[in-house]
């Protein structure tokens, strides 16, 4: 796949890029994040390969490299949490219990930018009940850490989160940092309260009828503390309404959330095809380094795979690949049935060498512009 060509764009030296590309190629072959599996897929002695991978992980700041994949043309940034189970890791320090209170594992919060219906990762943090003391307070701090990690990159862009993030402490942090946000409201067993006034004397009940157009509440107090805008819709076919909390204009917040809802988050392919949930590291430091490398590998493979999908299933000319806009296809087209990464890993050999070279050349141009901007 000529990963080295892409690696040279984001790594500081050609020598480092060469090492990284060998490891990333092996990750795709192994379809595994485990160093032993990766070393086995590399040419040469497996034991020597294993040590080389370990040295590489120790020496490189892969989180910094991952941030270079931030798409500056993105309108918004997505926060996407997932649970990674580690049922056998009883003595691993960073592993705690997941939301069911029993299963061993940890949380991974990934920040990503949208790219034609896909999520391109650019930052993440890991945390668990074992790495924090007070669950509510520390969860807030970990979520803040994720945002703080790329705050300079985010700039004026809006951050979009799901309902796990609609709690007061996190919203207050975003407000202090003057970050624009759109967050789905958690309407669980204990929904948050809203008030017309900061003294909490006049409570407001969110109400909307099925099929009713957007219901908007402007400048109301969330938990009686923070001024926010709230917008709700209840569309036919849904059991309950969708409520959005935002510091944007309500209509704009709803528009952005609807765009986000059409985007495939990255964890389905990361777990299903690259088996990221099988990651095994005793050290949290090495865990985060290998996860960063997996995300970098995924991002490059995603771009190439999406181009292959367009060429093979939508009959796009290889030199006319456009990863910013999806091709025009019938709803019955198989283009809608497969992800680009699936085609790259499972069906790449069906392309002739010339076509594959043209695809990679086109994708490299897109990748270069993604990293450095269009006008470099």
Identify the residue ranges that each predicted region occupies.
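Single, function-defining residue in the core of a domain
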Residues: 1-34, 41, 57-60, 70-73, ...
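Active-site-proximal, Lys/Arg-enriched surface segment
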Residues: 47-116
